[in-house]
Amino acid sequence: ELSELIFSQKIHNNKRPALFFDRDGVLIKDCNYISDPDNVILEKCSKSLVRFAYNQGWIIIIVSNQSGISRKLLSWEDYSKITDKMINLFGKPNPFYGIYANSQGPKSLDKFWRKPNPNMILKAAEVFNIDLNNSILIGDRKSDILAGLQSGIKLIIHVKTGHGFEERKEVINLEKNYSEDFKFINIDNLCEFPKKFLYKIL
């Protein structure tokens, strides 16, 4: 099952790049299948980075696997409350154009929406007329990185927050298999995000 929350009706005539974020361990602390809104804590520098990108005119999208729902560890209602709390913490106006999540688990028969499949990203690109070639993906897991690569995103940023520390070696090995057409940047956390890539979009 896919949850598609669309907050912006701004569909630009010309394709624009987007900043694609994973949620848990990237934007908010990974609390191991978070189900209580009171446990929503922003990762260091996530708010300042998101607001900077928003002010620069970037489309900002969240794409996350939420297998805790299919595992019965939380409900879609819990997910909705967590989403509301997170958006509130990022301040007004809401910087997110769209938030995509799927409940498919690693053992689900249907994994169409589940990362590393790129389909949540491709869906958002269709809805918001996104230029994937010039977009950026930020994730903490190998599955995030693969989803970005398979969707055609050329700039991939891996963080060590969340599961990033334990998956960094695998991510580096993965990066070696891709051509120079792709750019990989491995950072400790969002405070190190190279803002030079977030050029102003008119």
Predicted regions and their residues:
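Active-site neighborhood of HAD-like aspartate-dependent phosphohydrolases
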Residues: 15-61
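Active-site phosphate/pyrophosphate-handling residues
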Residues: 3-6, 41, 48, 119, ...
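Substrate-recognition element of Asp-dependent hydrolases with the DxDx(T/V) motif
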Residues: 46, 50-83, 95-105, 110, ...
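Flexible, glycine- and charge-enriched loops at secondary-structure boundaries
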Residues: 36-43, 75-79, 114
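Conserved alpha/beta core of the MobA/IspD/sugar-nucleotide pyrophosphorylase nucleotidyltransferase superfamily
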Residues: 1-15
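Asp-based, Mg2+/Mn2+-dependent phosphohydrolase catalytic module
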Residues: 15, 77, 81-97, 106-137, ...
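Residues that scaffold the ATP/ADP-binding catalytic core of kinase and kinase-like folds
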Residues: 8, 30, 72, 196
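Short, small-residue-rich loop/turn micro-motifs
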Residues: 23-27, 103, 160
